[in-house]
Each structure stands twice: as C-alpha cells, then as structure tokens.
Amino acid sequence: MDFLVAVKKTVELRLSTEPSPPQRTAPLVDFTKAVGDFGIIAEYKRASPRGVVRLDLPPWAYFAELHSYASAFSVLTEPFWFLGDYRFIPIAKAFKPVLMKDFVIDRRQIEAAYGYGADAVLIIYRLVEREKAMELAEYAQRLGLTPLVEVDNAQDAREVATWGGRVVIGINARDLRTLETNLTRAFDIAKSLRGDVDYIIESGISRPEEVEKACLLYARGVLVGTSLMKNPALAKELKAAAERCLARR
C-alpha cells in the first residue's frame, strides 16, 4: 500500500469522528497577495511519514520567532502522520496569513480550514480524481480561500495551469507515493510553467542558493518545513536570499 492510499484511509476515519468547525472570527486575507512577488512560507511540522521532526518547539514560539522573515505560515493539521492539529491555525494566524496543509478529500475539511481561520488550503491533485480536485478548489474559492493545488509532475502541472481563477500550483519536490525528494525535478517543472500561472515550490529547500534559484524561475515563493523546524535561525538567511533575487529579477 503506497502512502497516499494509507493516508486517505486515515482521513476517512477522521471525517467520521471530527466535530463541526467553529464559526470564523479571523479576517480573511488574500494569500497570494500576502506572499507577494516572492516570499518564504514557513511550515510548522512536528513530524512526517519518515519520523519525528521536532517536538520541543511549541507552535507559538516558532511563529513568534519566524514572523519577521516569513510572508506566510503553513500549518500541518493531519494528526496521525504529521502530529498536526487544527488548533495550530489560529496561533499562526495571530502573526501571518495561513495555509492549512492536510490531505483534503472532502468539503468538510475546507470548511474546517475556513472556520479555524486559514486563508488558503492545500489540495493534492494525486490524492483525488481530477473532477474532485476541481470541485474542491472551486468550493475553497467560494469560501474566499486560495486553493494551493499540489502536483509532482509536469503533466499534472500543465493540467492545473488551465484551470484559471485564483488557483496557485504547489510544485512538490517530494513524490508522495515513494516519499523520495528530487528538487531538480521540481525546478524542471517550474521551468515549464514560467509565466503561465502562479506557483510555489515545496519540499527539499534548505539552502539560500535554492531559494534564489526558485525566485529566478519566477516562482511566487518557497514552502520550507523541516529545515526551519530544525533550525529556525535559517529563516533570516532564506529571506536575505529572496531579497537579493528580487533586486535582480
């Protein structure tokens, strides 16, 4: 059983037991505008399918330390594989706009993202059928959320690029079926999209030169999780790299 099949089963279990989300009280922010021409999206991720990332860094401390360097935050809410929690969203939202990152297969999860205060929601193209992914993205837009549609190959990226609207493509350097990471492949996909659609690059970013390369490919930003969880001080270097690139772009 590959990872996506396994995780889909856990999501179905969660949906049968989770309570209704709260009424939204946080202001809704245009996530793409918040990221700007090129921004760092810092992700709070306590664990991954490969194991624990870091448990001794509470969310409020992480967000407080990084908010000066990040344009937005990404919050993992999946509890079994990533030790995430919806309640991390309002903590992040106190500092910056928020992307809710989960394995979304149902409208109820988008409603939870909205209710807890997120401004954008991740939709993994390979997790659901094409029509379902489009339906979820459209529903997110109706609620005022920005859908970040994640792909890991050029064919899917070109397909999503035809959708229009406020959809942002997330190019994942990690293949979610094998969990292998290939940043070069992600950059190659980005080259095929340049100028056609807004996109960010996810996974595998850990060095300033990788941030600069993504920026020079006209990505709207990079999403960085594990590297910043292990070393939050890296955020200052990554932001400086982004600023250097924007000055040349």
From Swiss-Prot:
Catalytic activity: 1-(2-carboxyphenylamino)-1-deoxy-D-ribulose 5-phosphate + H(+) = (1S,2R)-1-C-(indol-3-yl)glycerol 3-phosphate + CO2 + H2O
SUPFAM superfamilies for the chain: Ribulose-phoshate binding barrel
Molecular function terms, GO-annotated: indole-3-glycerol-phosphate synthase activity; phosphoribosylanthranilate isomerase activity
Annotated Pfam families: IGPS (PF00218)
Gene Ontology terms: biological process: L-tryptophan biosynthetic process
Pathway membership: Amino-acid biosynthesis; L-tryptophan biosynthesis; L-tryptophan from chorismate: step 4/5
Keyword Isomerase: no
EC identifiers of the protein: 4.1.1.48
Enzyme class: lyase
Gene3D superfamilies per UniProt: Aldolase class I
UniProt keyword annotations, A-Z: Amino-acid biosynthesis, Aromatic amino acid biosynthesis, Decarboxylase, Lyase, Tryptophan biosynthesis
Similarity remark: Belongs to the TrpC family.
Listed name of the protein: Indole-3-glycerol phosphate synthase
Organism of this sequence: Pyrobaculum neutrophilum (strain DSM 2338 / JCM 9278 / NBRC 100436 / V24Sta)
